[in-house]
């Protein structure tokens, strides 16, 4: 029901209203962060009178796995293959690489935080050329290795600067954006391992030190 919860805003409100009218629960906790208590925590905070001001998160276990797997011996194309082989990505990994899944998750979190937002309102920056998304899946696999050298050169540069790639979803000042960011050492997102997810929640109460929720974010066992 991730698609339903991130569909047109009026449809999302209708789903929740219908559930209330019929006395049933509309549960979708695992839509974001697998088994992590993210949606319920936001609901509890708002229920207590708090207000969400900013969301900063890594919400794709697949993409985090890919960028954590990159090395001198494992180029981008191989890392994407490994994500698929290990069950982290969709059968068509372009769904993950496009960031569309992360956009849906951010929309859900923003809505649960009390904001009116639709998928098309979120700014997205692709790190894979659009041409690889437009063709067939076979075409994607055939041309993905063409990006390996570029990503390896950038990976080496980041390593020298003590930075790491993270695909970050952010909601701030009433606007949403997702994209690949260079994260410096010392930032909470820097040491995120494997396919883990992390969320930093800035609220009126948790303002100076945002609330942090972190843990496994992909895989059938936790979803």
Features from the language model and the residues they span:
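Short, basic, helix/turn surface patches
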Residues: 24-36, 54-60, 119-127
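A short glycine/serine-rich beta->alpha loop
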Residues: 25-28, 51-52, 91-93, 210-217
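Rossmann-like dinucleotide-binding core of oxidoreductases
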Residues: 32-33, 42-46, 50-82, 92, ...
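Substrate-binding/catalytic subdomain of NAD(P)-dependent oxidoreductase enzymes
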Residues: 69-70, 78-191, 196
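Catalytic, metal-anchored helix/loop core of enzyme active sites in primary metabolism
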Residues: 54-59, 64-67, 82, 173-223
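Rossmann-fold NAD(P)-binding glycine/threonine-rich loop
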Residues: 2-29, 34-43
